[in-house]
Structure formats: C-alpha cells, structure tokens
Amino acid sequence: MGTDFVEFILLPSLMATLATEAPNVQILFVSPDRRNLEAMLANSELDLVIGYLPEPPKELIRRTLFHEPFVCVARRGHPVLQDESLSLEHFVELPHVQVLLRDAAMYGDAIDTAIAAIGLVRRVVLWQPNFLAVGNVVSRTDLISTVPSRVAAHFVQELPIVAYDPPLALPAPDFAMYWHSRSQEDAGHKWLRGKIAVLLKP
C-alpha cells in the first residue's frame, strides 16, 4: 500500500530488482482507507504500508525510510511569478491545486498548519486524489501547487514547470514502512523490507 508518489519513486526500481532476484514474486499496490490499515495488516490483506502517516497505529512496527521536503511548482511563464523566488504574498494569494488523499489528513494538513501558524490562509481551488496528475494541471493553468521534491523534479524535467523553494518553513514528512508483528521474522518479508529500504534511500 502506498500513494502514487511512492509508486512513482519505488515501483520501477523494485520491479527491475524482482525481475532479476525474485522473478516469481508478484506485487499488488493498493490505496486502502488508512483507518483499516492495522486490521488489513493483521489479516494478511496487506503485507506492508509505505507512506506518511501522521498518527500510525501503535501496534504496527515502523521503519523510517526518508524525509521528503516540499517544493512549490508553477508553470513556466506564469504571469505573476516573474522572479526566481516565490514570495509569501504570492504563495497565499495564488490559487492552489492540492492533493487530497483518501482520508484527507496527510500532506495538505501539514502545509496548512504551517501557514496558519503565521496567521495566514492559502487559497485552494482544486483538490486531486494523486500527485502525478497535478503536473498537467499546473503546466496548463495559473494554479500553483506544493508537492514532494522528487515529484517536483519530475515535473520540471518532463513539463514546462518551474520549481520554487517554499516562502515559509514547511515540515519535511517522514516516509516510513509499516508492518504487523506477525511478519517481523518472516524471511521473505524481511528480504522485501530490506530491498525497499535500499531502493528508497535518497
């Protein structure tokens, strides 16, 4: 289980690794309701959860994989953003597209909490369920977005998009891997966890 961001940075290298080292292993990537993660791991409906969980179930075993800073993105030639930096004024005034994951409690909350701490509110006009679709919207409109840095790097490489440092301090979420204690000593599970940890190392 993981977001499309995790799919984007993990699946190509993971599948290449499995093709040579474990060709009989099959992967099913799903995005279940976060409220059911503990039960799904306990019932073997899921083997692993990978992502950013602000309040993970205490019964799960956790391994931090990496910290991912946020980056702001806008289309090249944006009529307002002519400078090399993004001002706080423009950040809160320009319309945003925000990723809204299944239970609405992940990335957007972290960003909006940081903005609220300095007494401001940004203007979100579009919510989307995944990160990679954001690039097409940003590249064709005057909307801006705040996304994980590796997503932003992909946008800049593939689309007419410019990346900016955020004009305020934003938390860098901890992306981690979670699993149930029943899988802790399983040899195959340990092998897969080790491979994923190496592949996701920044």
Give the ranges of each region predicted by the language model.
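Short secondary-structure boundary segments
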Residues: 53-54, 76, 148-151
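Beta-alpha-beta core module
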Residues: 58-64, 68, 129-181
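Flexible hinge/capping segments at coil-to-helix
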Residues: 60-96, 180, 189
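Secondary-structure junction motif
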Residues: 52, 80-82, 86, 96-118, ...
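Alpha-to-beta junction loops
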Residues: 25, 41-50, 70, 120, ...
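Central regulatory/effector-binding core of bacterial HTH transcription factors
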Residues: 1-58, 128
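A late-sequence structural motif
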Residues: 9-10, 161-202
